[in-house]
Each structure stands twice: as C-alpha cells, then as structure tokens.
Amino acid sequence: PFLFDQTGFDAAIYFGDAGWPGTEAHFLMHEYPVPVCSPTLPGVQPHMTPEAIAELPLLQQSTRPYAWRQWFAAAGVTTPRAMTGMRLELFSMLAQAAIERLGVALIPPFLIQQELANGSLISPCPQSMPSSRAYYLIVPEHKAERPALTCFREWLVGEATENA
C-alpha cells in the first residue's frame, strides 16, 4: 500500500496491478523479460532453445519467484530446474551476477540496454514473456490535478509510450 498521507511523496512508480484505493494509476508499460547472460558463460551458444536454457544455471529474482517457471511454461517446457538457482533481490544484482558468469537471468531489456549494447550481456534465446503485471505511475487522488504533477505525469507517460 501507498502511504502518501504519511509521507512527503507526491507519486510512486509501481510494478504490479492497478487499483489502489484513493489513488489514480496511470499505465506506463508492460514488462517483457528475456533470458540474458554473459557471452562467456560455459555452455551458452547463440540461438539457444528454451530446453537448452533449462540446462544452464538459472538466476532467480526473489520478488518474482515464479518468473522462470512462467517463462518455461510459455515456451511449452516443463523443467524441475525452473525454481532452482541463486536468488537475488534487484534486477541490477541479477544483471551483475549474469555478467560475472553465475548464470542466466530473466530481465526486461529496457533495464539493461547499455549491457546489451556493449556485449557484456547477450540474450541467447530471444523469447520474451509478457508479465501479467505492469508499471504504473500511482498518484493520490487529492494531488492528481496539481500542475507540476500533471506535467510530470504527461512527460513520464509520453516517455514510457515512446520507449515501449
């Protein structure tokens, strides 16, 4: 829950479902994570199948514990390994672990554009999986019409739409 009345915050960017009481939720973007790893991870090859990805060490994000299972299910693959592997809390931690050759992580490409561009991370299997949740700008109803917040909201929604 958002405690806007008890803090000085005017808004929050939230990944989840819309519909928090007393707030307006403005859709920003869906999340489409893809498998990423170091190009030098042992066993990795270009153009791998989901079945081949299942044989590599998997890196898990603790806040999305079923992500690999859902990704494999969307690819039609059943593997007991979908719930195994090192668990990390943040996408930045997953990205660094993947760069350090600790395994394959599921990360939305928009969060690792630089790493993909410079080759420190690759996507050996480009199959993405749309998340059932999305990113939203959450604004308390009583602050929604403030000019500065309206300007920020319009800019942020425009940027998210342009870069989605």
Annotated model-derived regions:
Residues 4-5, 53, 96-101, 116, ...:
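Hydrophobic residues within well-ordered alpha-helices
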Residues 23, 123-126:
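Short beta-strand/turn micro-motifs at beta-sheet edges
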Residues 21, 42-43, 105, 131, ...:
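Alpha-helix N-cap/loop-to-helix initiation residues
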Residues 40-41, 111, 143:
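Short, well-ordered alpha-helical scaffold segment located
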Residues 80-123, 130-131:
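Hydrophobic hinge/microswitch elements
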